[in-house]
A protein has these predicted regions:
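Extracytoplasmic low-complexity repetitive segments enriched in small/polar residues
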Residues: 81-84, 101-103, 118, 129, ...
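A short beta-strand element within beta-rich, extracytoplasmic domains
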Residues: 93-120
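Activation corresponds to long, low-complexity, non-globular regions
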Residues: 46-53, 209-243
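Aromatic- and Gly/Pro-enriched, solvent-exposed loop/edge beta-strand patches characteristic
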Residues: 45-69, 119-211
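Secretory targeting and sorting signals
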Residues: 4-9, 15-44
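Short beta-strands within extracellular/lumenal beta-sheet-rich domains
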Residues: 72-92, 158-160
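A broad structural signal for short, well-ordered beta-strand segments within beta-sheet-rich domains
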Residues: 97-99, 143-146, 236
Length: 243
């Protein structure tokens, strides 16, 4: 009786061991599949490239509070070239703008009062996604999208970073729009530093024209960027995560 009972126990133990082995093998396969999926997903994430448009080895100091103190106002603009690149804000691959920076001067109280009176208050800026209209000269750009307006008063004297979520396509230009004024401007630089503004040709230097200028802020419309300024730079950068 005991021997028969022992033989039955042995057979049952063997069957249990086989089931346990199968269960362990299935679990191992599941873990391996999850690990491989996680590795694949991680590789896809790691393959995305982050590009900082407009970045240079050094950033020039903004013009204020030194004299002459200059700021940009009532305009949409973009950098045509800087010391290191042509069209430094042109997008080369599909992706998304994730953040952008402005290097802001700290104007004196009297300088701030002047700009507030001339352009309006408070100092503000936003990003603009532009696409050139083929065959136009002076160039015209379609405003494809734009970011939120940021008030700059709390950040004067700093380099500030703002978050963003703007889709971009190859060929887009990421510009900056200033509804009032922004002391994110350096002048007296080398001849390679050139930027364009959303003003009509012939309305580039007269103070009345500049004051009455209108930034390009209606999405889906076209604007003329007929004014080109040399030896100066708009002090912004844009971080794009490419798809």
């Amino acid at each position: 009786m005991s021997m028969t009972a022992h033989g039955a126990d042995s057979g049952m133990s063997a069957r249990v061991r086989r089931k346990v082995a199968v269960a362990v093998l299935a679990t191992a396969c599941l873990v391996l599949a999850v690990a491989q999926f996680g590795s694949s997903a991680g590789a896809a994430t790691a393959s995305k490239t982050t590009v900082v448009l407009g970045a240079t080895a050094t950033t020039p100091d903004p013009s204020c509070p030194s004299l002459p103190c200059q700021a940009v106002g009532s305009v949409t603009g973009y950098q045509v070239s800087n010391d290191q690149a042509q069209l430094p804000f042109r997008v080369s691959r599909k992706g998304k703008v994730k953040s952008w920076t402005l290097t802001l001067a700290q104007p004196t109280n009297s300088q701030r009062s002047f700009f507030n009176g001339f352009f309006g208050t408070p100092p503000q800026a936003r990003l603009s996604i532009l696409l050139r209209v083929a065959g136009t000269n002076p160039p015209r750009y379609n405003l494809r999208s734009q970011g939120s307006i940021h008030v700059l008063s709390p950040y004067l004297g700093q380099t500030v970073r703002f978050g963003a979520s703007l889709k971009v396509e190859p060929g887009d230009i990421v510009g900056i729009t200033v509804p009032t004024w922004a002391p994110a401007f350096a002048e007296g630089l080398g001849a390679k530093n050139v930027w364009r503004a959303s003003r009509e040709p012939g309305s580039c230097t007269n103070s009345t024209d500049v004051r009455q200028g209108e930034p390009h802020m209606r999405v889906g419309t076209r604007g003329t960027y007929g004014c080109k300024y040399s030896t100066a730079r708009l002090l912004y950068t844009v971080t794009v995560v490419e798809d």
